[in-house]
Amino acid sequence: MKHFEANFDGLVGPTHNYAGLSFGNVASYSNAAQTANPKAAAKQGLQKAKALADLGMTQGVLAPQERPDLYTLRRIGFSGSDAEVIQKAAKQAPALLNACCSASSMWTANAATVSPSADTRDGKVHFTPANLVDKLHRSIEPITTANILKATFKDPHFFQHHAHLPEHAHFGDEGAANHTRLCGEYGHSGVELFVYGQEATNPNAPKPKKYPARQTLEASQAIARLHQLEDESTVFMQQNPDVIDQGVFHNDVISVGNQNVLFYHEQAFLNTDAKFDEIRRKMNADMHFVKVATSQVSIDDAVKSYLFNTQIITLPSGEMTIIAPTDCQENLAVFAYLNELVTLGTPIKQVRYYDVKQSMQNGGGPACLRLRVALNDQELAAVNQDTLMNDALFGRLNTWVEKHYRDSLSVKDLADPQLIVESRTALDELTQILKLGSVYQFQK
């Protein structure tokens, strides 16, 4: 039986905009109020996904959320027709309207945490949608996320879906952006590394001072229990609070792993040596810890370029490749480091660069755009085949984007009631292309 890692990229939604909603995310804040190009953003994401499929990788797509989210706006007291709800919110509470129009679900690294069947006691692939309670605009995602995941990974013989964790700061969960699975081979049991920002129930434990720690130890432990993971296949490691305060809002901004490689900045973690020893002890394979020193790449350069928000993939040839944003080429220190990295004798042998600038300007690089799902060939056969990237789907989705998406969207445009009609028309057609059924509230 073959085993491999599939990547499921989030399709960029029609309301992609720069409202600067994510405190602690430097790129999101610094580009607030710029005019976005939803059509270009969606096409950039599709091109990156298709490029990985063309490399021989198993690549899928996940549908975006319904936005504007009129159901949340009605729940908080705005009434009338759909157009009146939008107009009232724009006048009385524009910040709330902005939150209900966010296309942030494109960053599917935050959609859920996934544990493969090789790690779980019941031998199923487990999914838990992230509750994303730290950010209003993302906290309204989990129910629809669950619908989309269930429509993509449908067969209960292979896939186990859990409800998101309780919606409280104690269980703040940001999904796979704070989770890396380390292993020798994808089909062998591995070590699931859960990285957290603070302990919610321990006021004396280290935590950041300036920006919020979005992931708690308690949430990570709950996910491990739900996913039926053994103690010997889990490691819980704290992210350095100082780097959170420098804009490292998720662990995938400061480290990334694949199989037996963990690529990380030397300032990424607390108690690094002891925790790496624990990983080595629990692994059934040799580990390569690839450290980037501050003298080579500063935290500031790492955050601006998203050096660590890259993907490390294993090609069908067995060779590892980094999928990086073109921003890494444009940063002299980062580009020099990556050119050196491929000569150092690690399993990482090449770097490929892709333009995802529309996403980058909102604070999300290549790793943010994908949810990793390790599968075997039987499990892959049970996945909704209409969500898997190939030439035909790439063509259909590009045509769909060209038909439905605007090429310019400013924050003030979010008050246009026509955006509701455009978005729902697009998503209704998308559910037919991907054969998802009725995953959105407006379809029910």
Curated annotation (Swiss-Prot):
The active site is at 174, 250, 368 (nucleophile). It catalyses: N(2)-succinyl-L-arginine + 2 H2O + 2 H(+) = N(2)-succinyl-L-ornithine + 2 NH4(+) + CO2. Its EC number is 3.5.3.23. InterPro entries: AstB_sf, SuccinylArg_d-Hdrlase_AstB. Substrate binds at residues 19-28, 110, 137-138, 214, 252, 362. It holds the Pfam family AstB. Keywords: Arginine metabolism, Hydrolase. Pathway: Amino-acid degradation; L-arginine degradation via AST pathway; L-glutamate and succinate from L-arginine: step 2/5. Homodimer. Belongs to the succinylarginine dihydrolase family. This is N-succinylarginine dihydrolase. It comes from Shewanella denitrificans (strain OS217 / ATCC BAA-1090 / DSM 15013). The gene is astB.
